[in-house]
From Swiss-Prot:
Active-site feature positions: 5
Keyword Cytoplasm listed: yes
The protein's name: ATP-dependent protease subunit HslV
Catalytic activity: ATP-dependent cleavage of peptide bonds with broad specificity
Entry binding sites for Na(+): 161, 164, 167
Organism: Caldicellulosiruptor bescii (strain ATCC BAA-1888 / DSM 6725 / KCTC 15123 / Z-1320)
Amino acid sequence: MFHATTIVAVKKGESVAIAGDGQVTFSQNMIMKSTAKKVRKLYNGKVLVGFAGSVADAITLCEKFEEKLEQNSGNLQKSVVELAKEWRQDKVLRRLEALMVVADKDHLFVVSGSGEVVEPDDNIAAIGSGGPYALAAARALLQSTDLSAAEIARKALEIAASICVYTNNNITVLEL
């Protein structure tokens, strides 16, 4: 499990949102930064990505993923499969410790270095140390409220931050 971050993504109707907290924890016991941006828009603002794990590793993977998107003309499904395959097989990349959540208006995926590419059945994904809390909160909010995808993502992350010591309330939300 990766400490020091929480990312949650929610797809609802024609909208998709991803939210990330801003905490960077060093050596599992010291907050180094509280305003980090762990969610981004890629491919001319058409793809959302959030990452958990080692910062340098996550940035490297984000750059690799952006290359795949360019090579595949923005085809998210093909790009994540190619990234996961390369991530698992490449001697350098397979040592990277990170997880990614990626989404466009049609798909939402969790991608890992062990080759997993998972598209959740309920259109909600959460990773990082606060991921289980954010996932549970997002599911409850999706089922019991009329909130938008962005509002659900923000509230789910706020709930996770109130429980997980590796997650803070400095939340960035991006939406398509």
